[in-house]
Amino acid sequence: MLIPDRRFLARLEPTVGRVLIIDPNAHAARLITDLMKSLGAREVVVEATEARGLQVAGALDPGLIFTERSGPHLDGESFTRTLRRSHMACRRVPVIMVTSEATATTIKGARDVGVHEFLRKPFTSADLIKRVENVALKPRDWVEGVSYVGPDRRRFNSGEYAGPSKRKSDCAMGAEAEA
């Protein structure tokens, strides 16, 4: 297993201090638990169902949530959608979806309900660390709209677009910049 250095672990600490794992498979949950503890997690809570996951999320106020995509009494997309549209303090917390069903459709579905990262099974410790690093050290803007609540789905927004403006707000921003 990869052993990250202390400075890296210190940068992850605010995100990985309290972790919620929602997975009906005890072995998979144990693997994620062990990896998160090696990254400095002080408190890891595991739940097997969507309903319990939502209850615990409200009480625990985790810094990071892992959810399996599907299982008995668990729909990871429904969990994430409900969390994102709730009034819980943790509604903006990074969610990493874990599944063996990594198709374009499932990845798009997860992205469209507000999942930050997608982790395909089987995965290595390096795969998990990379996802945790992405959510902890490369935060994305938050978007709230009628049909979507979650992190900005544009992962690689350079902000250096120099083409024609297409929105009224773009034109207004351009006028302010010229003034």
Model feature map: region roles:
Residues 7-12, 137-179:
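CheY-like receiver
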Residues 9, 15-36, 46, 65:
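Conserved acidic segment of CheY-like receiver
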Residues 41-48, 56:
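Short hydrophobic/Thr-rich beta-strand motif most characteristic of the beta2 strand and flanking loop
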Residues 59-71:
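Active-site beta3 strand of CheY-like receiver
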